[in-house]
C-alpha cells in the first residue's frame, strides 16, 4: 500500500508548514510552492493536511 500526495499549486501559499511537520520529509519548497518530492516515503499520517491552512494538500491511499 502506498499513498498519493497532491498539492494544489493554485492554493499553496508556500508557508512551509507541511515541510516542517512531515516526519519523513516528503515535501520541499520549490519556487515558493510545496512539492511532494519523496511521495513514496509518505506514511499517510495526514499531518501535512492538518497544518495546511490553505487546504492545498490531499493524501489518498492507493
UniProtKB/Swiss-Prot annotation:
Its cofactor is [3Fe-4S] cluster; [4Fe-4S] cluster. PROSITE patterns: 4FE4S_FER_1 (PS00198), 4FE4S_FER_2 (PS51379). Binds 1 [3Fe-4S] cluster. Binds 1 [4Fe-4S] cluster. Ferredoxins are iron-sulfur proteins that transfer electrons in a wide variety of metabolic reactions. This ferredoxin serves as a carrier for pyruvate dehydrogenase. Pfam families: Fer4_10. The keyword Iron applies. [3Fe-4S] cluster binds at residues 12, 18, 52. Residues 3-32, 33-62 form the 4Fe-4S ferredoxin-type domain. This is Ferredoxin-1. [4Fe-4S] cluster binds at residues 22, 42, 45, 48. It comes from the Bacteria. Homodimer. Keywords: 3Fe-4S, 4Fe-4S, Electron transport, Iron, Iron-sulfur, Metal-binding, Repeat, Transport. One of its GO terms (molecular function) is metal ion binding.
Amino acid at each position: 500500500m502506498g499513498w498519493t500526495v497532491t498539492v494544489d499549486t493554485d492554493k499553496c501559499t508556500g508557508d512551509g508548514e507541511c515541510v516542517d511537520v512531515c516526519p519523513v520529509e516528503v515535501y520541499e519548497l520549490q519556487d515558493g510552492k510545496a512539492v511532494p518530492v519523496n511521495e513514496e516515503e509518505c506514511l499517510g499520517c495526514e499531518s501535512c493536511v492538518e497544518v495546511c491552512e490553505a487546504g492545498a494538500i490531499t493524501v489518498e491511499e492507493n
